[in-house]
Regions:
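Glycine-rich phosphate/adenosyl-contacting loop at the front of the ribokinase-like
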Residues: 2-102
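A glycine-rich helix N-cap at a beta->alpha junction
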Residues: 119-135
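Generic hydrophobic, aliphatic-rich segments that mediate packing or membrane embedding
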Residues: 82-86, 112-116, 137
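Short acidic, glycine/serine/threonine-rich loops at helix termini
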Residues: 18-23, 113-116, 142-143, 159
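Short, electropositive alpha-helical surface patch
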Residues: 105, 109-124
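Glycine-centered loop/turn motif at secondary-structure junctions
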Residues: 80, 94-98, 121-126, 162
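Conserved phosphate-binding/catalytic loop of the ribokinase/pfkB sugar-kinase fold
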Residues: 103-106, 129-132, 140-168
Length: 168
């Protein structure tokens, strides 16, 4: 085989905002729990989209997160999303002389977007068409209760697609 392999990706690239020690049995989270499958509420181990969740709760995501977390900031921020994470892993294990890994996408011109852009630039992935635009950075709020299920732990996920909608 001659020539360089080029792997290009577009899709889910976001920040994961991890909140540790969220008590899934607390009064703060109870109003936001799912009552039946697919209703837009929170369910252990499952992801819900921001639009569905806000409709279910009748409140903005920022207000809901503040209520659930007691207004505290997330404990950890990471690069997330299956598209970019798999591309980063591929770029880390391949020879850059033989394989070029590229990503195309969007994030917001907010602090999370600046974090994401800065973090992505430290990876071996080539940001071919990655721009910060006037929209919210795609994010997943990860609520973690390590005591849930008799100490086995579990997470609940709320995804905001934000600027990713604007990639054309």
């Amino acid at each position: 085989m001659s020539g360089k392999i080029i792997v290009s990706g577009v899709g889910c690239c976001l920040v994961d905002l991890l909140y540790n020690n969220i008590d899934f049995g607390s009064n703060a989270i109870l109003p936001f729990l799912s009552k039946k499958r697919g209703d837009g509420g929170l369910t252990p181990g499952k992801l819900v989209f921001q639009d569905e969740f806000e409709k279910y709760c009748g409140e903005s995501l920022d207000l809901i997160i503040s209520k659930i977390t007691g207004g505290r900031k997330y404990d950890k921020i990471n690069i997330g999303g299956p598209s970019i994470v798999s591309l980063i892993h591929l770029a880390q294990v391949t020879d850059p002389e033989k394989c070029e890994v590229r990503f195309y996408g969007r994030a917001g011109k907010d602090e999370k977007g600046k974090y994401l852009f800065s973090s992505l630039r430290k990876t071996p992935v080539i940001l071919k068409d990655f721009k910060l635009i006037d929209n919210r950075t795609p994010s997943t709020f990860v609520l973690s209760d390590p005591s849930f299920n008799r100490g086995h732990g579990e997470r609940k996920f709320i995804n905001s697609i934000g600027a990713a909608w604007d990639y054309k």
